[in-house]
């Protein structure tokens, strides 16, 4: 199964649909509001799980379908949004890696609007202020949340790209006031291998 089909299956076909009263509903997508203070998104599952995945499917009907893995019980949610709606300004207490499975996806990071295209990735450090921009153009985004406990494992792996190494070292050293992100555009010949790895990782989280 392709990564796109797997993400669609997770976010759009799970039978258990949670209501907007569920705390995970607002964690997945908090709309922009008049609140001045940024939201701090905490790690949503047990810290014993070093990694989680969040699948977003944005459709032309101005609805976001989403699901979190691992989750017990499994669920999905359907969230309406007006075109070009922004989420609430927020940070995370974990690293976030976003991969654009299909379509395009825009974020406002540190006050700058950046559009990511199919096959591109964005790695956002903790405490980096950003907003997600929801558009009615069809797109699928796969987010991975990386817990602090996983930093050592990442740092011990063989990472060829020096910028990634520097970024992770900075995060690992807990320079909490340093706000940063990285935008990656993999070569076309590397995309199939990368998607195969992400697919396998997602399958492991689904269990």
Language-model features: locations:
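Short, well-ordered loop/turn elements at secondary-structure boundaries
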Residues: 6, 93-94, 101, 117-118, ...
